[in-house]
Amino acid sequence: MGLTAKLDKLKLKTTSEDIEDDSGHAKPDNSDDIDEVDSEYQNILLSIIAQLRPGMDLSKITLPTFILEKKSMLERITNFFQIPKLLIDSNSIEDPLDRFIGVLRWYLASWHISPKAVKKPLNPVLGEVFTCYWDELPNNKSAYYLSEQISHHPPKSSYFYIMPEEKIRVDGVVIPKSRFLGNSSAAIMEGCGYVTLGKWDNEVYVMNQPNVYVRGILFGKMRTELGDHMYVKCERNGLEANIEFKTKGFIYGTYDAIEGIIKDSETQKELFQISGKWNEVMYIKNIKTGKKEVLYDTRGSKTLKPKVRPLEEQWDFESRKLWKPTIAGLAKRNHELATEEKSKVENEQRIKAKKRLEDGVEFHPKFFREVNENDNGVKNLEYVIYKKFDLKEDPEVLRERLFTVAPIVPGQKFDEKFHYPAFKKPESN
């Protein structure tokens, strides 16, 4: 049986009966937490994997829909911004070392926000965009996010986040590279993020991501692990953190543990130790005094989900609208429908890619332009938002400038230049 036939077999089984409300509508909020890899699905997955070789790139392999999350990677990135109070609190701290610890706390706190079951976000198509906003932040503050898939092979997702009243911005790119490792698969998370605190004279924090592993593909129970090293660095204040996300050994060890240090970048003197579990309680210990306290307890964490414009106001290539039929199938656990709708989107993109190749047309992002010599300190991003955002400006000026990039809040209209390539648009109003 070929790979396509094995995937088609997934269409024969669907279990939507138990997840519909009285009106017949699917309940989408909890289906990502349902582990659907039963014995039949596991056998199908095993048949697919049997055709792979260790180290093989998985980016061109069509995975069965039962392991897909009901959101695009462009939306998944917003997990970083769903505990905004921690970032706001960090921005109010006078002491540079304590402020660094606050930013580290905010970043580490976000990793537990994920489906309970093993789920992979939908791969964004080239040119796909996602925008959202938060209008219920503390003290009536607001935040905005926009992202775009700037490359498909390899996949690259650029994003921009701004909290105008706090004068905080985050620029970043996520570059996942999937590999098959035998009983595991790995998403090697390349890319990085830059957090800029305008209140502190544009103090910048640079950070990367741990890698993501799915264990138990061939035998054992499937589960997700974060692994390897993550760093946070602030060159201005000469501080850095190196955090190891420990993976469980075959015999010894525990799941989800972290261990790391905060140190002085110049002297290499270790100042604090970090320990605990990234999805439970994390601790920080002052090496000089020996005092140990809770850095963050995820078990009491409250998240603020992003808000989006109504679907009828969205462009066809905005994530929620583009993947709506696929997400509907996933919500009902109707994998025949989900596979069919997902294939429609992907086939359309292949046709467009072929047409661009035949016509000699190069793709250019709408929101992000290539980094140039004037973009100090963000060379690793490759692309940045094309508009200039000076955090010293009034919050309302920053907000209105952002709204000229793309509609983000309900009621906004598309500008006539929306479809122009970013490099052809003016960086200021």
UniProtKB/Swiss-Prot annotation:
InterPro entries: OSBP_sf, Oxysterol-bd, Oxysterol-bd_CS. The keyword Transport applies. GO terms for molecular function: lipid binding. Disulfide bonds: none annotated. GO terms for biological process: lipid transport; single-species biofilm formation on inanimate substrate. SUPFAM superfamilies: Oxysterol-binding protein-like. Keywords: Lipid transport, Lipid-binding, Transport. PROSITE patterns: OSBP (PS01013). The C.albicans mating-type-like (MTL) locus contains, in addition to the genes for the regulatory proteins (MTLA1, MTLA2, MTLALPHA1 and MTLALPHA2), a and alpha idiomorphs of a phosphatidylinositol kinase (PIKA and PIKALPHA), a poly(A) polymerase (PAPA and PAPALPHA) and an oxysterol binding protein-like protein (OBPA and OBPALPHA). OBPALPHA is not represented in the genomic sequence of strain SC5314 because that haploid assembly includes the mating type a allele of this locus. Belongs to the OSBP family. This is Oxysterol-binding protein-like protein OBPalpha. It comes from Candida albicans (strain SC5314 / ATCC MYA-2876) (Yeast). The gene is OBPALPHA.
